[in-house]
Regions:
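Surface-exposed extracellular loop regions of Gram-negative outer-membrane beta-barrel proteins
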Residues: 251-311, 413-469, 529-543, 606-630, ...
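Catalytic-domain carbohydrate-binding cleft regions of carbohydrate-active enzymes
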Residues: 287-291, 309, 318-544, 549-560, ...
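N-terminal secretory signal peptides that target proteins for export/translocation
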Residues: 1-7
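Structural preference for beta-rich elements and adjacent junctions enriched in aromatics
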Residues: 27-420, 430
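A short, polar/proline- and glycine-enriched secondary-structure boundary/capping micro-motif
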Residues: 112-119, 161-163, 202-204, 321-323, ...
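Exposed, low-structure sequence patches enriched in small/polar residues
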Residues: 369-371, 377, 456, 460-842
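Outer-membrane beta-barrel transmembrane domain signature of Gram-negative proteins
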Residues: 231-252, 394-456, 570-619
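Bacterial N-terminal signal peptides
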Residues: 9-22
């Protein structure tokens, strides 16, 4: 009944919002005509109806293409902005009741130098960005100047699709099934594309008007040309599109896709863990388990008319997703991990707000199962966007979906959002309502936000206010920013954040901390016109001030940065920064007890960095960064990193990144200890806040290899070797005796290498401090899209960790099988095959 009550509240909220006529909602918005070319004239193109669809083979030889009017008025966007393109491009558009057909002739004076790139479908960075010849076409089918659908094909025939959101960015996680083929001859290369109307969203009418833009990239010249001319610095994406007309009597398209999957494989784990971390370090519990798994589920996508979509998933599997990077976090602040699961990424940009009220990684945590999830999303003719996402999870993951559904450890999640376009579509207001529940614990969050885009997108006012309710405890949060960009030589911004003591959206959202007031201001100057030495240059200065609600300064930071892009496309950047003396009210957080100690004083620290990056369009790319910092009390840190990317063939890419971080801390936080004091036959406990001098080191080595076997087959390999070391000075333990001060040396000594009832294990031996930690992650995925939308996966993953033992080489690490005191290790591995098959009805 509680679930039903939550949904009833949501429906009431939706109804009130939709019928708020005094705000102008529920009325058709009249979107303005676009003026996108150099002289503010309207760019206009026409699609022609055809009785016979063209054969999609990449060869535009059929007479049906003669019906269409060719579009060829492209101009350079880069490197020579607003000048004529160096190669000719012609585009033709046809349509029938089922699909839109695009024919493209990409003429080239040197066809043998056209750059091809085989890569996994939808991987923009591996198959498109700066490394191959490609063509894109964008459609604002809703004609709201805020959203769009993007379709891209490169010179190897690899596809990529995305959506435009908020007129500011792209969502590359949107995936659709459409057909394209390419061909090459002595005149250049050619594309034919078939885009079903069912995968786009529009309002049916006798004569539709869409927004449209097109782009081409010629790799050997590093030349980017577009249909819509954009002077450098002009902001906006969909709001800059030209008009596409000519559609007549296109029926509303409905989409039904059913994607069941079956998965089979095994997991194994071996190793040994310390039975008692505070023991003599020689008592272990063995790890030795093999699990075999056969599972299945289904995804369903249903298009309601041409404006709304329902996505449902039952028992989804994301085992082929790349593992999160290794990290050790013993602080108060939760580690933030990016979302990689397609169900939660696709059409999720509507939930992007100044305060992260929806953090989808909350759903389906480790050792839990997502039993089912669904979302409804769309946009109405009157400019109202909406999305509702719900999920039901089990806190335990057994071998059976049905048994997990019946257990008592169930949790539900509900996120909902409404966004109404205002001011002729350049701005919007929004509402958000979230709810979670588990084990008698419930939360409810509500938020309202607004984005105003004024003066041709030069002035942006973006703000949000949020209220949280956790079992009756109410919290308030606010985030706002004013930004101005004059599109030529400077931009500036001012932002403010406020979160009271009770604000807590972390059941479904993400907020690092409450009890905070944050101010930030910045100014950037830039040079965008190419000169004799560089193509682009910028310099910026930023200032940030943070305090808690008691007025204690917890952050006071200023930085300045500088960057240059040379005419050969090499880049350099540098910066200096200063963190003024302030306090940390969360440093003395005990990871085991979750208790907080007094505030700690932090010294003034100065830092600097320098980085260099080679031309990213070349087969060999390199980059390096060096950074150093030092405090007035002798703390120091340094970081060196190098990046190498190689593309030895048109189908293989490999990259390696190495980072070495070293630092020295005068006082490295350890823990809160307890001392029992006998006072007149009555024991009392005194708390001690312990620190140590520490030499720290962290090394990270990652290696990636991707190989495109065909446009529908790929192999991807990823590995990460992670090492973290803390060398504590056991003669230099310190204690924080008073708040807002530095820790000092005292006679109190709670540690011993032979602990007993009156002492604790030395921190460098205690494995809960991860003073000697190493891990290796390996991930290998083979993908084969054997039919449009249907995919076969072969997935191998392994992870080994060692805690408490230093390894000199990777070989020593990999061959280690335990046996040392105060040291533990585990090796986990899995091998799976997964098959999904797409059933589709027009």
């Amino acid at each position: 009944m509680d679930y039903l009550y939550k949904f009833q509240k949501l429906i009431i909220t939706l109804s009130v919002f939709l019928h708020a006529s005094n705000l102008g909602f529920g009325q058709d918005i009249v979107y303005p005509d676009n003026t996108n070319s150099i002289n503010n004239s309207k760019k206009l193109a026409f699609a022609s109806r055809t009785k016979e669809p063209p054969t999609i083979d990449g060869i535009l030889s059929e007479d049906v293409w003669d019906i269409a009017t060719p579009i060829s008025d492209f101009v350079q966007d880069f490197p020579n902005n607003l000048t004529a393109s160096t190669e000719k491009t012609e585009v033709r558009l046809l349509f029938d009741d089922y699909a839109l057909y695009v024919g493209v002739d990409l003429f080239d004076s040197s066809p043998s130098e056209i750059s091809e790139r085989l890569a996994r479908r939808d991987d923009w960075m591996a198959g498109f960005e700066g490394i191959s010849d490609w063509f894109t076409i964008d459609f604002d089918s809703r004609y709201d100047h805020q959203t769009g659908f993007v379709f891209a094909v490169n010179a190897s025939g690899v596809q990529m699709d995305a959506t435009v959101f908020d007129d500011t960015d792209y969502d590359e996680e949107w995936n659709a099934v459409w057909h394209s083929e390419i061909s090459k001859d002595m005149t250049g290369w050619h594309i034919e594309i078939e885009i079903p109307f069912s995968i786009m969203r529009y309002t049916e009418s006798d004569s539709m008007v869409w927004g449209m833009d097109m782009a081409r990239y010629i790799h050997r010249k590093n030349e980017h040309i577009t249909w819509i001319a954009r002077p450098r610095g002009v902001r906006g994406i969909a709001s800059r599109y030209g008009k596409l007309m000519g559609f007549d009597h296109v029926p509303a398209a409905k989409q039904i896709e059913i994607l069941p999957y079956v998965l089979s494989g095994r997991n194994s784990i071996k190793g040994e863990m310390l039975s008692y971390p505070d023991s003599l370090g020689s008592e272990f519990s063995p790890l030795d388990r093999i699990d075999r798994n056969l599972d299945g589920g289904v995804d369903i996508k249903y298009g309601i008319g041409s404006n709304s979509t329902i996505d449902l998933t039952v028992n989804p599997d994301f085992g082929w997703i790349e593992a999160d990077p290794a990290i050790i976090n013993l602080t108060y602040y939760e580690t933030y991990f990016s979302e990689k699961r397609p169900f939660f990424l696709e059409n999720s940009t509507i939930f992007d707000t100044p305060i992260e009220m929806f953090y989808s990684r909350r759903i389906g945590k480790m050792d839990s199962r997502i039993l089912t999830a669904g979302k409804l999303s769309g946009k109405s003719q009157d400019g109202l966007s909406y999305s509702v996402l719900g999920a039901l999870t089990s806190d335990y993951q057994s071998g059976s979906w049905a048994s997990d559904l019946k257990n008592e450890g169930l949790s539900y999640y509900l996120a909902s959002r409404l966004v109404q376009d205002i001011l002729m579509g350049n701005s919007f207001v929004g509402l958000m309502f979230n709810s979670t529940g588990r084990d008698g614990h419930s939360t409810n969050d509500v938020a309202a936000d607004q984005l105003l885009s004024i003066g041709n997108n030069r002035l942006i006012i973006d703000q949000q206010i949020a209220l949280t309710d956790i079992t009756g405890l109410h919290g308030l949060g606010y985030a706002g920013e004013i930004a101005y960009d004059n599109e030529t030589f400077f931009s500036t911004y001012f932002s403010v954040d406020y979160f009271d003591d009770n604000f807590d959206n972390n059941d479904l959202g993400y907020n690092p901390r409450n009890d905070l007031t944050n101010f930030e201001v910045g100014l950037t100057f830039r040079k965008q016109e190419p000169g004799p030495i560089c193509r682009y240059a910028f310099t910026s200065i930023d200032y940030n001030h943070q305090s808690n609600l008691d007025g204690l300064v917890i952050g006071n930071y200023v930085s300045t940065d500088f960057g240059l892009t040379f005419n050969n496309y090499w880049r350099i950047s540098a910066g200096i920064n200063r963190s003024f003396r302030h306090y940390d009210d969360k440093l003395t957080f005990d990871i085991e007890t979750h208790n907080l100690g007094p505030y700690v004083k932090l010294p003034q620290t100065d830092g600097a960095y320098f980085s260099v990056q080679s031309d990213q369009t070349k087969q060999v790319q390199i980059g390096a960064t060096i950074g150093k910092g030092k405090s007035i009390i002798g703390d120091w840190g340094e970081q060196y990193s190098i990046y190498i990317n190689l593309r030895p063939t048109s189908a293989i890419e490999t990259s390696m990144y190495y980072s070495r971080n070293r630092s020295f801390e005068k006082f490295h936080w350890l823990e809160i200890t307890e001392e029992i004091i006998n006072e007149s036959f009555s024991d009392s406990i005194k708390l001690h806040y312990m620190f140590a001098e520490s030499q720290n080191q962290m090394n990270i080595l990652t290696w990636r290899v991707s190989a495109g076997l065909a446009t529908n087959k790929s192999i991807e390999f990823y590995s990460e070797y992670f090492i973290s070391r803390n060398h504590f000075n056991d003669q230099q333990y310190l204690e924080l005796l008073e708040a807002k001060a530095y820790p000092v040396h005292t006679e109190y000594q709670p540690y011993s290498s032979l602990p007993d009832d009156s002492s604790l294990l030395e921190p460098y031996l205690y494995n809960e401090f991860y003073a000697k930690y190493s891990s290796l992650n390996l991930n290998l995925v083979f993908r084969w899209e054997f039919s449009p939308g249907s995919t076969f996966y072969l997935i191998y993953t392994t992870m080994k960790t060692i805690n408490g033992k230093e390894s000199v080489t990777i070989s020593d690490f990999w061959n280690y099988q335990g046996g040392d005191d105060w040291s533990e290790f585990s090796t986990e591995g899995s091998l799976y095959i997964k098959l999904n098959y797409r059933f589709n009805r027009r």
